[in-house]
Amino acid sequence: MGLFDLLKKKPASENVLADAQPEQNLQPVETQQKGAEPYLGDLEKTGAISELVKTPHSGRDAAWQKEFLQIVSQASFQCGDPQVISGPDGFPYFQLFLPEPNQQFQCYVIDRMKDDFLLNLGYAVVINPVGEQPDWVFTYGDIVNLHVNHIFYTNDETAFSKNRQDEVIQSKEKVLIGQPSEYILPLATRQVLRSFLQANGISVPKVVLMQRQDQIKSHISQDLVFNITPENFGNEEDYRAVMQHLAWFLPRHYAYAGMSENALPEFEPL
């Protein structure tokens, strides 16, 4: 197969498989290194979160969400018991709850947790998972974005492609192939992705960063491309499910695709 191969994009929406992560990931974690300073969150922001979550889910508009997201990473939380649960999507989530008034608690702060263990262990975060609906759910990819961009969600224009459908690279396009930097894929995230793909039958997961320029419109876009094709799976459904799962590991504005190794000799192991 030549370079002008079919770029198999993730589907826009699709059901995902259960048990997306190995169960051994659901273990208590040592959250702080010995001798390190304990987490100290911002109790004022904790109080603000406590007031915000009193608003029913139906009333949480854009202004509510903006305020919540601006302060939640610095607020103080306590962990659940167990610390980590398997979500309905099969992925591991570290449980955080608002502390009880006038009671001592071990403090957890998302901004500290992300670098101490969330990124390395492949954990997402769920806030107040009680009742029918938690107050907020952050995927692992949201935590990655907090690490690299200091915000959970990037809504500004980026170089990543907005196309989520399968594509064919046109002969008039300029294509540049390289490796994603640490800023795009941190080392810890590479390792987490590698473990996930190996658990799903990709023995040597590989990746490239593909930049494409449309000579007619002079538009430049980029995609992460993994060595994943339907031929790696027993059927198209399993392939599509794994491709959909990848979205959980990546910031939401990232675009990614699968392509045969025969089409891209520049692939390198994750």
Predicted features, each with a name:
Residues 2-270:
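An interfacial alpha-helical scaffold signature
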